[in-house]
Structure formats: C-alpha cells, structure tokens
A protein has these predicted regions:
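Cofactor-binding beta-sheet edge motifs in enzyme active sites
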Residues: 1-279
Length: 279
C-alpha cells in the first residue's frame, strides 16, 4: 500500500500523507486476484499511475477554469494547483474536488468529479533477476553449520521505495536460510506429523540470522510503463541452495555432497559418512 500511495501521490502531485489506499474490501473492489506472485507493483502500480494521471488531467481542467488559464499551464505540486510561474496563487486539491462536481470544464470528459478507474493488463510476466551468497562455518565434530554472513543482489527494475524493497529481500532471505538450515516437516511411518509445534519445528531466531547485506542493481522492465519488476518472492527462493552450496564448499576437503535440506547436523554427518564410504 505504501508504494502504491507513493505512485499515486507522485503522478497526481498530491501530498503522500493525503493518499489513502483501501484494500481487501470486496464491496468496493470485486475484481482482483490477491497480492501474491510478485505482481503488486508490476500489475497494480501501472494501473494506479494511469488512474492518477487521469485524475490530474481533470484537476488541471478545473483549476484552469478557476484560475483563468490554459490546462497545459496548470501545475500540481504538494497538493496545490497553480499557474506555471505563479505558485503564490494556488488552489488545493480538496477545493478542486468540490469545484469539480459542478465544473463545466469537465463536460467534454463525460462526467463530473475528480475520479477515474483504469485497468492494466501486462502482455507477459516481468522476470526479476538476482543472486545470493552465504558464508558458513561448519564444526566437523558436531556437524553443526552456522551462518556467518549473507548477501543479496537483486534487480527490481525501478526501485520505488528502497527501504521496502530491501526489507522484502531480507525477510525472504530469512525464509530461505530457514529452509536451508532449520525448518522441516517430519512425519512418522504412519503419516503423523511430528513437527507440528514450535517445540519441534525450528524457526530462525535472532542469533541464527547475521546481518543481511542488500545491493540493488536497476535494469528497468519494458513490460510495464513504470519499469518495475517483482520482489516479493525473490528473497526466499535462492536461500536454501546458497547455504547448502556454502556448506559443501566449507567441507570440500571431505568431498561432501548434500542432496536434501535442511542441512541439519544429522544430514551433514550422514553426508560425511557417505563421502568416506565413497573413498
């Protein structure tokens, strides 16, 4: 919601704090497929941008009528509409929204009021690219692996909000390291789940997670007009593989090969025994 509000405020010329994003209300928005699949910014973002531009066009027409100027000469910044070069004489967007109800300037556009509804249909998905690297330490006696450092490099296309993007990638990376080192659904021979509580299902704790460094490299997408790419899933996907590869590298002298995760001490010990048997 934060990034969508940023886009709306930027395109319209409104103050960010004045933008309210309503989500999940099926009485107002019956059409939608949810927020999964790394598609919020890639799909919803362009629709929000186009809608804000249409509202801005209407606001400029109303402001031009009130300020006795051409719509092309109207600027809207920080929630104020004014004639270019004369910012001292301005009208708030709130006042314009009231004036728009009766404004004759909107007659050619078909309806009164500062409102718009648009849809964006992407031609295909926006592929995001990235990589992750882990530094681990393995105790060859206890077969315990410990994560020492972690880094993420990701291409989000255009970064609308770097803090949110980095946070998503870091949160996803924690999920990935959990899959690589800790979390596992364990069943007995009858199919009974044995790791069904936090007593048995190991989730990452603060001391399991090192500082996660994030670097963003921007290569804008050509699939949507904002140039954005998905981020939500990208942080979680490479983690387990990065950690297992790091463990294999740490144990390269033992010729260890790990084919299954998470890399628990039991699995690492078994992999070391298998390597010894292979000679």
């Amino acid at each position: 919601a934060t990034t969508l509000a940023q886009i709306a405020a930027s395109e319209l010329g409104a103050n960010f704090d004045d933008v309210i994003v309503r989500t999940g209300d099926t009485t107002q928005f019956p059409f939608g497929m949810g927020t999964g699949g790394s598609r919020v910014m890639a799909n919803s973002g362009p629709a929000v941008a186009q809608t804000a531009r249409e509202v801005k066009q209407k606001a400029q027409a109303v402001a031009a009528e009130l300020l006795e100027a051409a719509p092309a000469d109207i600027r809207i910044e920080r929630g104020l509409a004014f004639v270019a070069g004369v910012p001292s004489k301005s009208i708030t967007l709130a006042r314009l929204s009231l004036a728009a109800i009766k404004s004759k300037a909107l007659k050619p556009l078909g309806e009164p009021g500062l409102n718009a509804c648009t849809y964006f249909y992407p031609g295909t998905v926006t592929w995001a690219f990235g990589t992750q690297a882990a530094v681990v330490e393995v105790d060859t006696e206890s077969c315990q692996a410990r994560l020492l450092a972690y880094a993420v490099v990701h291409d989000p296309g255009r970064t609308v909000n770097p803090i949110i993007v980095e946070g998503q990638l870091q949160g996803g990376a924690v999920q990935g390291l959990a899959a690589g080192l800790l979390e596992e659904l364990v069943y007995d021979e009858t199919g009974q789940l044995l790791s069904g509580s936090f007593m048995d299902y190991a989730i990452p704790k603060c001391d399991d997670v090192p500082s996660i460094d994030v670097a963003l490299t921007e290569h804008r997408s050509i699939i949507n007009p904002l140039g954005v790419k998905g981020v939500g899933e990208s942080g979680a996907i490479p983690g387990a593989a990065a950690i297992v590869n790091a463990i294999e590298d740490a144990l390269v002298d033992f010729d260890v090969v790990l084919r299954e995760g998470p890399a628990t001490p039991r699995r690492i010990w078994q992999a070391m025994q298998d390597a010894r048997r292979r000679g």
